Amino acid sequence: MKVAVTGRPGVGKTTLCLKVHESLKDKMTVGGFITKEVRRDGVRVGFKLVDLSSGNEEWLARVGEGKARVGKYAVNVEGLEEFLDSVRTDADLVIIDEVGPMELKSRKFVRFVENLMGRERLLFTIHLKSRHRLLDRIRREFKVYVIDESNRNRIAEEITRILEG
């Protein structure tokens, strides 16, 4: 089953991915990555990618100047592309958090995700409003859940059951 989760920023998409990972990691191999916020003194200063298999981290974006930008963030396209080389994709379940505007600055990331699309078990988080041919394809081919504070725990349990079966 291919599942995508979307919702507004901060609603719990990454937390949902971590819950699914925690529930399934002893029952099957799980690869992929999550994206975590980095805060300093309570202020978000960027995002780091975290490999679910190795724990390796790489900056995805930071506040500052750079060629590839999304809002106030400079996207570390080169770092993202190097990070992808070590992400485990031969697992029973691959989690990609997130397919969004920052990641889509990289053609290599787009190809990386396209190469996963034929897999049987996938869990992606997708940006709520972004338009891109890859996001359109995911919306067509995946079961898409829109989460909020009232349904995120129930949906995490439902997705775990679906992906386990």
From Swiss-Prot:
E.C. no: 3.6.1.15
GO MF annotation, one: ATP binding
Positions contributing to ATP binding: 7-14, 93-100
Matching Pfam families: NTPase_1 (PF03266)
Reaction it catalyzes: a ribonucleoside 5'-triphosphate + H2O = a ribonucleoside 5'-diphosphate + phosphate + H(+)
Keyword match Cell wall biogenesis/degradation: no
PANTHER family: CANCER-RELATED NUCLEOSIDE-TRIPHOSPHATASE
UniProt similarity note: Belongs to the THEP1 NTPase family.
NCBIfam families recorded: PRK13695.1
Protein name from the UniProt record: Nucleoside-triphosphatase THEP1
Protein species of origin: Archaeoglobus fulgidus (strain ATCC 49558 / DSM 4304 / JCM 9628 / NBRC 100126 / VC-16)
